[in-house]
Amino acid sequence: MIWYLREVSGMFRFMLFGFLFSSLVLLGSIPDIDYDYFENDKFDLVDIDEFLGRVNVKNILRGRYFFIGIRNVANPSAVQALSKEKLDEIREINPVGIILFRENFKDAQQTKELIEEIKRHLGSDILIAVDEEGGLVSRASENKKLGVYNFPAMESVGKTGDFQLAYKIGEILGKQLRRLGINVNMAPVADAKFATNNPLGSRTFGSSSYNIGLMVEAFIDGIQREGVFAVVKHFPGLGGTKVDTHKDLALLPYSKNFLMVNNFIPFLFGKKAKFIMLGHVLVPKISADVSSMSKDIVDIIRHNLNIFSIIMTDAYDMGAIVNNFSLEHAIKKSLNSGIDIVLIPEGFKKLNVEE
């Protein structure tokens, strides 16, 4: 049993969690769905240590290096059910996983059928991911027909100081995502926010590295207990930046020692996450390369912090990459630095990444 479950003050936690759900109901955030569609809760609870040990890095990767998206914002129906030709095209890419976006979702049954078709064609071990952080970045729960609770932004959860609440949110999300066939959640955000006008906004648990670490650890334990892998992000931390990496490259003008104290602690707490995501940030006092292409950053993760999660990049269709590098160069640089997976939501088939 996870240690902090033994230290819960039962009535207080119950009241606090009940208050959260009451607030969500009043705000209309809990989706109106047909729960009869879902099977009863008959899947086994998963022992986290046994589960993560059994599903090891080599079994996940098997020589595959790319996580890709199947996108069509202008015509969502085109990516809510896939033709054999499209599936064959994806199979030629041989991705380790598929990340789904809002246009891939119509309702719960369609989503489950889409994922089952992907697995039939690409293999049952293909990873299926979504960004479900809570708050603004909630690709699944923003569709009320999917049966995923639309939790508030993690900043509000962090303010409660209640890491058992973070555990419960992770647990519920894990159960609901797994019912759909999703087995990876690109969360939690482990960045400690300390820069003025930081673009992360309410996505992070707050500014205290230690408190964020407790929240991150709890969320990861909760979601992975239900058989959904967590992705702790965005190492080395975006909380000290002032540029949104969706738009351009961010800068962290701090020393390694400063970041060890202010940025890295939450990632140490989150080391049980199956994946760790690198942000598109330049840290000139550590490396001349962008973090998502940097061997120096990989070495810090592996050798200084002793984190052995699978290392993946943030999305390579973001402004930080496309405005500054060719995708072919960025991908080769990342893989040569020791990064395990490159995330490419759009545009993969246009690339030539062969050596």
Give names to the regions the model predicted.
Residues 146-161, 206:
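A charged helix-plus-loop insertion that forms the helical arch/lid used to bind
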Residues 7, 12-29:
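Classical Sec-dependent N-terminal signal peptides that target proteins to the secretory pathway
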Residues 64-70, 96-100, 128-132, 184-188, ...:
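Hydrophobic faces of well-ordered beta-strands that scaffold small-molecule active sites
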Residues 30-128, 132-144:
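N-terminal hydrophobic targeting/anchoring segments and the immediately downstream early-domain regions
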Residues 77-78, 82, 107-121, 126, ...:
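Second-shell residues forming the walls of enzyme active-site clefts
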Residues 106-111, 158-172, 210-214, 260:
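Glycine-rich anion/phosphate-binding loops
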Residues 121-149, 169-192, 212, 220-236:
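Glycine-rich, aromatic-flanked loop segments that form ligand/cofactor-binding clefts
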